[in-house]
Amino acid sequence: MDRKLIVMAVCALAALSAAAPAAFGQEQKKAVPKLHIMHATKAVKAETGEAVKNEVAAMGASKKSGLPLFTYTIQSDRDGQQYTGVIVGADPTAKGGNKSTSVSTFIVPVIVVTQTVGTGLDANNMIVTAPGKTVFDPTKNDNSCLAAPNNNPLQLFQQSPIFQNYDISVGGVDMGHTQYIDAFQRAEFYNLLKNPDNYQVLLSPIKTLSPVVITVPAASGTTLPPEFGACGPFGIVDIDFFDAFLDNNVLPALQPQVNAGNFPIFMLYNTVLGFNPITDIFVNCCVLGYHGNTATNPIQAYSPSDFDTTGVFGPTQGDSNTLSHEVAEFVNDPFGNNPTPAWGGVGQVPPGSCQNNLEVGDPLSGTNFSPIGGRNGFTYHLQELAFFSWFYSSNSTGIHDWFSDNDTFTTDAGPVCVPAAAASGNTRPIVHP
């Protein structure tokens, strides 16, 4: 049986493509296409997901996953059908009991070493490469894309509102001194909570592990040097190679400390993922992050996320933007297959294409929550996220009866999405045996 990592394109970006020459030092002779941001999900098999739901519903826990989970069942007024899924945390509808949940989390810095560098673009806008080694090390100071005292990528990552407590408000209502995803979960189910202040879903405790080094074969990755228009080197790695390396090498090596009861986050720095051939950058790039699951029993959830400071993706789409997207989706759709009525033509799902899972980041990819000024003086960018009700119901469970945490969505997703007859190619599978 195959497992697939599904990726959908979101939005075109200008910085790199506008600056990229046909060859260094030459005048650009034709318009160059634009890069695209993509996010991804690697779901468990359908039968595994159903087994987890059934176990959690019957016993309050699953032998296939050590995560704290609750099940939900909802009759959607978008299509009249009933849907069941699992979410990380405590059931917001349950009476009494402990409504505070913590997920032990590991930050794993990934040092990526590529073996080639781009020297230009050919007539088909494919990257021309030559031998050359580049090291992307998030533990080292970067004085090209960052400035002291905030020039250490790993420290900035650790200090972000995904891991640290900040004063966060949603629609003028104080969500407390907490992490961004915890604030989102509280706002998402606000109308269901008798005492919202007691409802928490926290990443805690958080521990940073020793860096992992991944040396990328020449055929599976390359680097664009600053001459392509970024403030520093920009790495691209084949996502099939990368995910297989995590599955087969990194995750097994981190056991038993990293296990099915916790959540490892792999920090990439100015390095994105793409599909082969990765030199076809304007077609096969750029996956900034994904949340996935292993095919093992019990299931290991994990998420790689790029902390981008190159500016390639625009001034508001860097740093913690991808991290907020992926962690929120891990919490709300931990196994990648919580079913919803089909929706589409919004966020990273292009017109004529549809998606049908509870991926709370995807409908608003490219749209941000209010930036948060860090105590370190660094401004963190976080993505706006869709509430549970947006996917299922015209009656919002969210704060202010909203459908997203910055009020971009003022109604639910609307009529069930019907894909255009010619809509294909909007998903890109990573296939693992």
Where are these regions (language model features)?
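Metalloprotease/metallohydrolase-associated module, dominated by Zn2+-dependent proteases
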Residues: P277-F313, Q317, P334-P433
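Active-site-proximal segment of zinc-dependent metalloprotease catalytic domains
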Residues: F234-F330, P334-G336
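Bacterial N-terminal signal peptides
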Residues: A9-A18
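Signals and flexible motifs at protein termini associated with secretion
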Residues: H39-A51, E55-V56, G60, S65-G66, ...
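Bacterial N-terminal signal peptides that target proteins for export
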Residues: M1-A9
